[in-house]
Amino acid sequence: MTIAFQLAVFALIATSSILLISVPVVFASPDGWSSKKNVVFSGTSLWIGLVFLVGILNSLIY
């Protein structure tokens, strides 16, 4: 269970880092938002799911 928790935390950190870089780039590009809207929403949904997963796994471990 600890390995799953550590992998979930790593995935959350990696997703956060990717979104931290990619979202401003999408908003700064001329046609970025209209063409990359689904990618941003998918990344945000993944991030929210990982936050809940880390919370659930944390409550099971500690």
From Swiss-Prot:
The gene is psbZ. SUPFAM superfamilies: PsbZ-like. NCBIfam families: PS_II_psbZ. It comes from Nymphaea alba (White water-lily). It is found in: Plastid, Chloroplast thylakoid membrane. It comes from the Eukaryota. One of its GO terms (cellular component) is chloroplast thylakoid membrane. HAMAP family: PSII_PsbZ. This is Photosystem II reaction center protein Z. Its main location: plastid. Disulfide bonds: none annotated. Pfam families: Ycf9. It is a multi-pass membrane protein. PSII is composed of 1 copy each of membrane proteins PsbA, PsbB, PsbC, PsbD, PsbE, PsbF, PsbH, PsbI, PsbJ, PsbK, PsbL, PsbM, PsbT, PsbY, PsbZ, Psb30/Ycf12, at least 3 peripheral proteins of the oxygen-evolving complex and a large number of cofactors. It forms dimeric complexes. GO terms for biological process: photosynthesis; photosystem II stabilization. The keyword Nucleus does not apply. May control the interaction of photosystem II (PSII) cores with the light-harvesting antenna, regulates electron flow through the 2 photosystem reaction centers. PSII is a light-driven water plastoquinone oxidoreductase, using light energy to abstract electrons from H(2)O, generating a proton gradient subsequently used for ATP formation. The chain crosses the membrane at residues 8-28, 41-61. Belongs to the PsbZ family. Keywords: Chloroplast, Membrane, Photosynthesis, Photosystem II, Plastid, Reaction center, Thylakoid, Transmembrane, Transmembrane helix.
